Amino acid sequence: MFDTEVLLPDFWSILDAVPVTLLMAVTVFICSTLLGGLFAYIEHQRIPLLRQLVMVYKIAFKGVPMVVVIFLAYYGLPSALHFFATLFNAEVNAHSLPNWVIIIVALSACVAAFQAEVWKGALNSFDSGQSDAALSLGYSGGQLFRRVMFPQIIVAAIPDLANAFMVIMKALSLAFAIEVVDIFAQAQLTAALNFYYLEAFLIAVVFYMVIAWVVTKFADMIEARLRVRT
């Protein structure tokens, strides 16, 4: 039966996991955005061999479930780190790798495949005629990208970037599989103490909804300001 008396204690307990979850989400978002942007650039420039490797990467990481990638990273990253440490005669305890680092690496690798499509679409939306016009006016390659291309590309990408952030927030709920505690995991742990699962999960839902609302509003605000400038 629903008990309102546990809502406030559960709220404060689950709130403790919000900053950690947001920090991991932001870190994954930054890493995946940079990696995805690099992949999109390689595809846009049609760089031989690298373009084919990027395509294989995207197919692999878009097709394999994230939880599988997480476990592959969990069991594979320490071994890989130990191999490279041995190769370079470095003293590193590979098995002391924190689980939160493994989650960030695994999710960044997965989300980068989707972020590459976001940036690829944004790059394809840019009118190449503007590049010709800017170059004819004496713009350098750097000036062309900084003053003409990037402001328009980022505006086109913002809605999908906001969606990507929320995908990361939801994907972090898989982190508990390797004992990393996020909002969802904290709700499970809190409910396990008092057996009020419905109340704990409803509080988690509220946190997710508030974060989604803030991210959406922030993205809309940035997009509106950039559209005025461009």
Regions found by a protein language model. Name each.
Residues 1-230:
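Transmembrane alpha-helices and adjacent helix-loop boundaries
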